């Protein structure tokens, strides 16, 4: 993948490298559409690279782990007591903590690079074929910008329902400049997101270009990705009919992965992945990588010593016949025994469970990985240093998004049908007959379980306004006491927006 990276800016001069020695002039980069496509490819590389000289800061994967999962209610990081503030989201109330600063930096880097491409896109060319190429380039850049503002909004702004879009939004940069700007409203933020996506969809449709059909090119943005971004953005905005429309369009060319594909390690795109973060051994970020923090098979200590573990509260509502459960080391009651004797978050060093996991999961964990109850082996590295692609959008998410929108509109039969479509590939006997609040809880339970580790947990809690409840072993859960939470405050009232 050819790469050209530009300098970046958000709200202050600290984000802008004014005269980098390796800079290439706009005249060279944007000499023609073929050259400009390399710059668009560079946007994909920005999503997986080292940031701020800090391990764990890798771009998109950092957002999924540090904001999406660790502060949520689905995954705990083994017995890593030093991460209590991260796991409890305490850094959300700090204006100086790098864990919240890095996400702002990363997405505005994407936005600035997208803006530099958009500022230089050609229009009105007499050469129709060349103009179509430029339209394709512009459409891709618009998708990256819209996606970046969507992700920034769900982290740094309050929920849409808190003030119907009148609350503080973001700094909306649509050109390459570093001038001071006020924050927009949330409504203005989503007006720009929708505008960018509408234009991108129109350009993708009219230009006649698409990314290659090879699954290893799923890191490239296309029409389907534009619809997927629209689906997620509309979900945040509570724009239910728009969610339904774009969820259906986004997944039109994709199908739910098979049980074998689901258990294959989530490190390579397949028939279900709509968009991905690309990474392999030719472009590794080593110990900075997502897999070094969300896998149990990487040789890094953050993976081996403190592997991710799914919460018992997430597993318990799922039918035991579901084949997806096989990627988690779920103990039997006999293997656990007296819960009062369980150490911390469930570390095990000997006995039947330990021996079973070492044998059954031998190909899914590193040889010296510490064993825990409910150990997650969803993400398996391609190589020991942490290489592997990451799904940004899957067809399943689009179906859960649509189901949530259908529920909000009172279309319960549609919700039941969508749930059955997502679950039956893994449990042929699954039938959903629930209604009302029970149906809502069923939908949330399967969304949490299916999208586990993929960066959705905290964002979902915030959107739903759900309390954070992490039960200890004594309370029927599997959380260590130092990670446990009984926060009855709704998700819309905690997070960076409060600061």
Across the structure, where does each feature detected by a protein language model lie?
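Hydrophobic-face positions in mid-chain alpha helices that act as interaction patches
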Residues: 38, 244-391, 395, 450, ...
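Conserved, well-structured interaction surfaces
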Residues: 80-155, 184, 202-204, 384-390, ...
């Amino acid at each position: 993948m050819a790469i050209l990276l530009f300098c970046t800016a958000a709200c202050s001069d600290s984000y802008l490298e004014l005269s980098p020695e390796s800079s290439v002039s706009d005249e060279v980069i944007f000499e023609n559409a073929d050259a400009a496509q390399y710059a668009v490819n560079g946007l994909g590389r920005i999503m997986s690279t080292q940031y701020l000289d800090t391990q764990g800061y890798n771009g998109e994967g950092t957002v999924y782990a540090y904001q999406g999962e660790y502060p949520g209610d689905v995954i705990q990081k083994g017995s890593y007591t030093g991460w209590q503030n991260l796991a409890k989201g305490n850094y959300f109330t700090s204006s100086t903590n790098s864990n919240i600063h890095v996400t702002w930096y990363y997405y505005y880097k994407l936005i600035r690079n997208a803006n530099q491409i958009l500022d230089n896109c050609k229009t009105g060319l007499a050469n129709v074929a060349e103009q179509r190429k430029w339209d394709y380039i512009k459409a891709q850049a618009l998708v990256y910008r819209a996606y970046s503002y969507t992700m920034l909004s769900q982290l740094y702004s309050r929920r849409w329902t808190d003030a119907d879009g009148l609350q503080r939004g973001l700094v909306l940069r649509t050109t390459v400049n570093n001038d001071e700007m006020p924050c927009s409203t949330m409504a203005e933020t989503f007006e720009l997101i929708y505008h960018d996506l509408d234009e991108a969809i129109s350009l993708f449709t009219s230009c006649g270009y698409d990314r290659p059909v090879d699954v290893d090119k799923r890191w490239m943005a296309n029409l389907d990705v534009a619809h997927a971004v629209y689906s997620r953005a509309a979900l945040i905005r509570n724009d239910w009919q728009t969610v339904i429309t774009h969820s259906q369009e986004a997944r039109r060319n994709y199908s739910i992965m098979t049980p074998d594909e689901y258990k294959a390690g989530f490190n390579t795109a397949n028939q279900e992945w709509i968009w991905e973060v690309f990474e392999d051994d030719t472009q590794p970020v080593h110990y900075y990588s997502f897999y070094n923090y969300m896998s149990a098979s990487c040789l890094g200590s953050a993976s081996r010593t403190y592997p991710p573990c799914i919460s018992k509260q997430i597993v318990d509502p799922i039918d035991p016949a579901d084949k997806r459960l096989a990627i988690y080391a779920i103990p039997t009651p006999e293997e656990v025994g007296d819960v009062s004797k369980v150490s911390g978050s469930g570390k095990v060093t000997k006995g039947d469970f330990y021996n079973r996991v070492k044998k059954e999961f031998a190909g899914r964990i590193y040889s010296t990985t510490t064993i825990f109850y409910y150990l997650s082996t969803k993400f398996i590295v391609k190589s020991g240093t942490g290489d592997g692609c990451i799904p940004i959008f899957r067809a399943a998410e689009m179906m859960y998004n649509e189901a949530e929108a259908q529920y909000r509109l009172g279309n319960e039969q549609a919700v039941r049908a969508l749930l059955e479509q997502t679950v039956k590939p893994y449990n042929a006997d699954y039938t959903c007959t629930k209604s009302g609040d029970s149906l809502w809880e069923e939908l949330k339970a399967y969304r949490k379980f299916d999208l586990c580790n993929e960066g959705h947990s905290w964002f979902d809690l915030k959107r739903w306004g759900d309390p954070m409840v992490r039960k200890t072993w004594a309370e029927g859960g599997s959380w260590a006491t130092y990670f446990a939470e009984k926060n009855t405050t709704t998700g819309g009232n905690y997070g960076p927006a409060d600061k």
